[in-house]
Structures are given as C-alpha cells and as structure tokens.
Swiss-Prot record:
Listed transmembrane segments: 15-35, 47-67, 72-92, 107-127, 141-161
Entry's Gene Ontology BP terms: proteolysis
Entry keyword set: Aspartyl protease, Cell inner membrane, Cell membrane, Hydrolase, Membrane, Protease, Transmembrane, Transmembrane helix
Protein's name according to its UniProt entry: Lipoprotein signal peptidase
Species of provenance: Vibrio cholerae serotype O1 (strain ATCC 39315 / El Tor Inaba N16961)
Family: Belongs to the peptidase A8 family.
Location(s), subcellular: Cell inner membrane
PROSITE patterns: SPASE_II
Length: 171
C-alpha cells in the first residue's frame, strides 16, 4: 500500500459518506414531494400551528435571491456550488479524519450543495417544501439541502470561537 493511499484513508475525505447520505436523503424527499403533493400554496399541508409542508419551485438561491431573473442565475449558482464543493473537498483532504467537527461541517455543506445543484441541472429550479411561519409572517420555504448548508456554515462559524489547542513550544 502506498503512502498516498494511506494518507488518503486518514484524511477528512473519509467523511464524504455523510455528504452522500445528505444528497440521497435530500433528493429522495424532493422526489416524494414532487410525486405526491400538488404545487403551490393552495395545496399546502398544515402540520403544526407554525409549520406547513408546501411544494414550490425556487429559481434563485437562498430566500429566492435573484429568482426573478431570466435564468442565468441557475448557472451562476451551479458554478458557485461546484467551486465551493471543490474547495471544501480540498480542505477535507488536508484535514485528518479525526477532526470530526470541521469534516462534518464540510460534508454537510457539500451534500446540501450537490443536492441543490442536482435540482438546478435536472429541473431548472430547486424544490422547496418546508414552510415555517409565525402569525402571517412566513420564512421563505426551504429544504433539507438548505438546512444542512446552514448547519455546516454555522459549525464553521462556531469553530472560529472554539479554543484552539496551541502547538507545544520548541525550546
């Protein structure tokens, strides 16, 4: 066995199974929503006094950013997702597998990004289905991929506040 394959097995890339799990769960849920729910507000399913299931198309990014454009944003967001996924995979390759916090954060972001890219390429839009609200205010609809991207990003931010182990001094 070569040193490079051993190093690869010890790298954070071992956590890519989590990205694959997120991707599969995200796409499966979206297919179930598309096959079993009517489109739009009139077909929402009221689950709790603050939560609906709702099948909608998002042609933009988070919070429908740029959704009113003519379609170029689909490719912009797809390109951004590919760049971010490549960058995070590179960082995972450089991290030891034992750095669970960061590897999990990166894998969650990768899985969510790839799930939304799949939608953009295959459907031309992202399927959203989670609708949380308070009174008459509705948070923009979102999906599992959006959630894992946000959780991963929050983990990265929180990691910035965690105490780092200092390297032993070389005296």
């Amino acid at each position: 066995m070569s040193n490079s394959s051993l190093a690869l097995k010890q790298s954070g890339l071992r956590w890519l199974w989590l990205a694959l799990l997120v991707f599969i769960a995200d796409i499966t849920i979206k297919l179930i929503v598309m096959d079993n729910m009517g489109y739009g507000w009139a077909n929402r399913i009221e689950v709790l006094p603050f939560f609906n299931l709702l099948y909608v198309h998002n042609y933009g990014a988070a919070f429908s950013f740029l959704s009113d454009q003519e379609g170029w944003q689909r490719w912009l967001f797809t390109g951004i997702a590919f760049v971010v996924t490549g960058m995070l995979a590179y960082w995972m390759r450089r991290l030891p597998a034992s750095d669970k916090w960061n590897n999990i954060a990166y894998a969650l972001i990768i899985g969510g990004a790839v799930g939304n890219v799949f939608d953009r390429i295959v459907h031309g839009f992202v399927v959203d289905y989670l609708d949380f609200y308070w009174g008459t205010y509705h948070w923009p609809a979102f999906n599992l991929a959006d959630s894992t991207i946000c959780i991963g990003a929050a983990m990265i931010i929180l990691d910035g506040f965690r105490a780092k182990k200092s390297a032993p001094s070389q005296s």
